[in-house]
Amino acid sequence: MIQPDPQHRLPMKGVQEHPIFWNSDKKIRFLALTSDRLSQNPQEQKNIENLEMTKYLEMNSVRIAGSDWRLRLESELQEDLRKFRNYNDGIRDLLRALRNKRHHFRDLTCEAREILGETSESFFHYWSRAFPNLLRITYEAVSLDYEKTNDPFFSIFFDQSYCSVLAANVRRVAYETQPELTSRNGF
């Protein structure tokens, strides 16, 4: 909106559809779908690691979660996470943990359910308080691939008419603010 060059500005529709205006349920759904996209079957794993989206998320991992996202969670939730699988410190596993805790909410310990709350609002609030940049950076990351693939799973979150402007802005800012990371990650 504040870009001096009109070609770099999102149209009003793009601004109105920004995740800041989504309800909590839509935000959680978006993050869960992103996790699903990044956790495709093993035959696709090499392709997923080469996605611009994956590179962008990992390039911004410290901005999203610090050195280890697991340390930002309450100890009861950390314990609950370890019961079902091993999560590493990468952003893909952070998204997977959020997705799994939402999809298997009834299987959580009473303590973990109390921490996360019973509603979509309280659930999202917990994760956004622990990781304030997660939604924004994930949205930027997904825009990079949606621009190219028009993936139907993400069509409720993006519109092709403005996605190329959004993706171009994400790339431009990444190059300007993190040149050492963009070149090292082949971004």
Tell where the protein language model's regions lie, with residue ranges.
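Short intrinsically disordered, low-complexity coil segments enriched in acidic
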Residues: 1-4, 185
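Terminal C-lobe "cap" of eukaryotic-type protein kinase domains
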Residues: 3-29
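Regulatory extensions appended to serine/threonine kinase catalytic cores
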Residues: 26-187
